[in-house]
């Protein structure tokens, strides 16, 4: 399928963005996206994320910068730190990239982030999620458009194949770089791209298109499911608690999905399959006082006819070592413990949430992040040089 420049431009324009942010790696996908998007009469900012892994990463950065200078586009580069021990590089780098994109987006009234994912990326992601044993939400893979806390992210090339994109680049004499680390099969995505997909193409030459279609079907089905479940959840909830007698009137599969949705809405965390099974068994044989530890911070209790989320300990039971460990994991930098102060929350405490220009009262941030009111009193304020740098166990400031 040939890329229609007019269709891509019209799709971007329908969001009426004040500014366009492009994740620009210099590869063929983002180079084509940049080449098309620069024709819009909308301020455009290209962002290059330097992962500092490849010997040519600085050359690529210079290439991207020079391309932006050629077209008189704003260019921003950002260098990632070393991945923390025990973290998956792919997952960590993805989070770091998105965090920086959103930090830049906060500066504008209605920003739209453009990413160059294509049909082959979608097929690879679908396989990755299938290998993990994911449900509908995971198999939906890469969303075409997603609302962010500030602005949105659009992938206008998602329906086009890599071959389509390379053909457009050749036809329009677009210069781009090639990252030979894409051949390194120690990374799971590269293994799937370079070894598994070619085998599947022997069975179905259009495998990427087929898997991409399956991902779209899963996304549509999941959207419908979530809307129906959300409506049902409201009818069997009392504040943040679940009414057990109403829940168990429903089919088992609906119960399990509602348990997962209920916990995620109230904690922003997901239950594991094993936890859902245990929880489902418990609500169908309810015993007041029953409880299960979900993570280091959450417990689920049965109290009479209600399912309740609680912290496993009171705030006074949480040691300074636990808080420092959490801070070290989330701050991704060395901490001078002599400069750290930990105290309880005060009514007028403010925090400049990551990516924002101005501080907000914690009450406002708690509301925006949908942190349950029952949990907010458990917050610990972490200060360095008299400045709030984090709110344990919820988020980092800065």
Curated annotation (Swiss-Prot):
Q: Which locations, inside or outside the cell, does it occupy? A: Cytoplasm
Q: Does the keyword field hold Cytoplasm? A: yes
Q: Which GO terms describe its biological process?
A: tRNA modification
Main location, first listed in the record: cytoplasm
Q: List its EC numbers.
A: 6.3.4.19
**Principal EC category:** ligase
Q: Name one Pfam family in it.
A: TilS_C
GO CC annotation: what is one? Answer: cytoplasm
Q: Tell me, what is one Gene Ontology molecular-function annotation carried by this entry?
A: ATP binding
Q: Which UniProt keywords apply?
A: ATP-binding, Cytoplasm, Ligase, Nucleotide-binding, tRNA processing
Which NCBIfam families does UniProt cross-reference here?
A: lysidine_TilS_C, lysidine_TilS_N
Protein's job: Ligates lysine onto the cytidine present at position 34 of the AUA codon-specific tRNA(Ile) that contains the anticodon CAU, in an ATP-dependent manner. Cytidine is converted to lysidine, thus changing the amino acid specificity of the tRNA from methionine to isoleucine.
Q: What is known of its domains?
A: The N-terminal region contains the highly conserved SGGXDS motif, predicted to be a P-loop motif involved in ATP binding.
Q: Which family does it belong to?
A: Belongs to the tRNA(Ile)-lysidine synthase family.
Q: What name does the UniProt record give this protein?
A: tRNA(Ile)-lysidine synthase
In the UniProt record, what gene is named as encoding this protein? tilS
